[in-house]
UniProtKB/Swiss-Prot annotation:
Residues 21-96 form the Peptidase A2 domain. Belongs to the peptidase A2 family. HERV class-II K(HML-2) subfamily. The active site is at 26. The lineage of its organism: Eukaryota, Metazoa, Chordata, Craniata, Vertebrata. GO terms for biological process: proteolysis; viral translational frameshifting. The keyword DNA damage does not apply. PROSITE patterns: ASP_PROT_RETROV (PS50175), G_PATCH (PS50174). Keywords: Aspartyl protease, ERV, Hydrolase, Protease, Transposable element. It comes from Homo sapiens. This is Endogenous retrovirus group K member 104 Pro protein.
Length: 156
């Protein structure tokens, strides 16, 4: 799973105890939180001993009474004992993100700064495809070495 930073927030799916949930990747959250309206009624929960900080004031805060089996977005095995409260969407916190091996990377630019300036002046928009409708390739074509020494430039 990968997500480019954009105006859209990074969400991914996880399967907890066989049920699929979609949640926001939240590197600031220590624990994962499931929205109360998505928590299955037959799954046990208890009033949380500690409150939640950073999501405003939540009057009802619960925690799963059990440690639950979870599959991450790329089927990474993990366990979670999530908090449950009235929030608009689920949050995947560091308790799961660490088990999934999540990392934030900033790849090196594919092109030199000079070539990026030239392309921008020509109308290229980063992240969009090349071409009139911006639907062309988004990454450079990878050169392949001709090991057989056949074809253009080599005698037959």
């Amino acid at each position: 799973w990968a997500s480019q930073v954009s105006e859209n927030r990074p969400v991914c799916k996880a399967i907890i105890q066989g049920k699929q949930f979609e949640g926001l990747v939240d590197t600031e959250a220590d624990v994962s939180i499931i929205a109360l309206n998505q928590w299955p009624k037959n799954w046990p929960k208890q009033k949380a001993v500690t409150g939640l900080v950073g999501i405003g004031t939540a009057s009802e805060v619960y925690q799963s009474t059990e440690i639950l089996h979870c599959l991450g977005p790329d089927n990474q095995e993990s366990t979670v004992q999530p908090m449950i409260t009235s929030i608009p969407l689920n949050l995947w916190g560091q308790d799961l993100l660490q088990q999934w091996g999540a990392e934030i990377t900033m790849p090196a630019p594919l092109y030199s700064p000079t070539s990026q300036k030239i392309m921008t002046k020509m109308g290229y928009i980063p992240g969009k495809g090349l071409g009139k409708n911006e639907d062309g390739i988004k990454v450079p074509v990878e050169a392949k070495i001709n090991q057989k020494r056949e074809g253009i430039g080599y005698p037959f």
